[in-house]
């Protein structure tokens, strides 16, 4: 079916909260080598996670629109995940359920859409070109298909530069949650030109 030009409501009351929470500190000292055994071990531990979930604050900022929301991300198996965006009252603005070959999205009016590519669907329905296919790796602190990246002094991902389909995404990590094992990202910012996507993870549950 033809996808309409749907827009999430602009959740302005959350603006100051999200922007403050997602301020990224500068990185200290030189980064570690991507060839280090500590980095390879960290990647292996993260990739062995079968199920995980996280929730927190989401912001999308561009010249055309600003969207602020709460998010909930749940991975239940290989290529099976669920993404919720909610407003300050807790009402669902967007729910996306993805599994191999089938993606379903329900908007805040209860309208249901189906497709086979979650990233393309999100872009068409919300006007936000979120690199969802890559974000699934980046949110875990993994570089995905990117080969240009840097590590922090704890052998964790600190920056990613990824070029694909005319987009030049830069991902900067502001910290990690060491209460989880392995340590998972606590906040991050994606940017491409004037577009910015900010995520602050309140907590992680990993299995």
Curated annotation (Swiss-Prot):
Chaperone is among the record's keywords: yes
Listed Gene3D superfamilies: Lipoprotein localisation LolA/LolB/LppX
Lipid tethering residues (N-palmitoyl cysteine): 22
Record has Protein transport as a keyword: yes
Gene Ontology, cellular component aspect: cell outer membrane
InterPro entries (UniProt xref): LolA/LolB/LppX, OM_lipoprot_LolB
Signal peptide span: 1-21
Protein name as annotated: Outer-membrane lipoprotein LolB
Species of the source: Salmonella typhi
UniProt gene name: lolB
